[in-house]
């Protein structure tokens, strides 16, 4: 494995850590409605679980209401049940062919709890990025030990990996601050 391969691998895996964080932050509810909140809710469709977005049209009605319109009328009941049983704390209301999902306002205490969850997710992502840095540095040390690269090349490569790590940690911090601001906005 070359220095370029190690750097590329670290960069790719750090980007995946950022994507994972972004996906987990998207699931955390803020006071405002957004269609992405239902992305991970699965509904039984002919015996197999599928995301709601594959069996229904999901739209925003206003800042606090999501409208779910099933492609098949028979799916209204199972979709409503899946939303109600999800861990999102939502209470869907069936209106004939359409299901309305009002977003309850977050209490101050719930907002604080959610910001703690956001910080925890961010810390987990930072730990993952730092572990990737450590793995890359260990791979570089192995190259030096096997006399494939010089110590100067190792130092330069470690500096590159450190820059990637710093950039990833900075991006994580920005995501956390942004999500906390969304949650705390009343």
Curated annotation (Swiss-Prot):
Q: Which UniProt key words apply to this protein?
A: Cytoplasm, Protein biosynthesis
Where is the secretion signal located?
A: none
List locations, semicolon-separated: Cytoplasm
Q: Which GO terms describe its cellular component?
A: cytosol
A molecular function annotated in GO for this UniProt entry is: ribosomal large subunit binding
Recorded hits in InterPro entries, A to Z, give:
Ribosome_recyc_fac, Ribosome_recyc_fac_dom, RRF_sf
Q: Which cysteines are joined by disulfide bonds?
A: none
Q: What does this protein do?
A: Responsible for the release of ribosomes from messenger RNA at the termination of protein biosynthesis. May increase the efficiency of translation by recycling ribosomes from one round of translation to another.
Supply the PANTHER family for this chain.
MITOCHONDRIAL RIBOSOME RECYCLING FACTOR PSEUDO 1, RIBOSOME RECYCLING FACTOR
UniProt-recorded name of the protein = Ribosome-recycling factor
Q: Give the organism the record lists.
A: Bordetella pertussis (strain Tohama I / ATCC BAA-589 / NCTC 13251)
């Amino acid at each position: 494995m070359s220095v370029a391969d190690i750097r590329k691998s670290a960069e790719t895996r750090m980007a995946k850590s950022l994507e994972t964080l972004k996906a987990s932050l998207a699931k955390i509810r803020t006071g405002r409605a957004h269609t992405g909140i239902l992305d991970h809710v699965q509904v039984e469709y002919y015996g197999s679980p599928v995301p709601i977005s594959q069996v229904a049209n999901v739209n925003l009605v206003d800042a606090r209401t999501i409208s779910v319109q099933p492609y098949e009328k028979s799916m209204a009941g199972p979709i409503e049940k899946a939303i109600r049983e999800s861990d999102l704390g939502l209470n869907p209301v069936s209106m004939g062919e359409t299901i309305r999902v009002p977003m309850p306002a977050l209490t101050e205490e719930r907002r604080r709890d959610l910001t703690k969850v956001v910080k925890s997710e961010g810390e987990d992502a930072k730990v993952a990025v730092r572990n990737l840095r450590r793995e890359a540095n260990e791979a570089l040390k192995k190259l030096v030990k096997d006399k494939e690269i010089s110590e100067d090349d190792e130092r330069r490569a470690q500096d590159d990996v450190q820059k990637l790590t710093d950039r990833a940690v900075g991006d994580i911090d920005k995501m956390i601050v942004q999500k906390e601001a969304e949650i705390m906005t009343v």
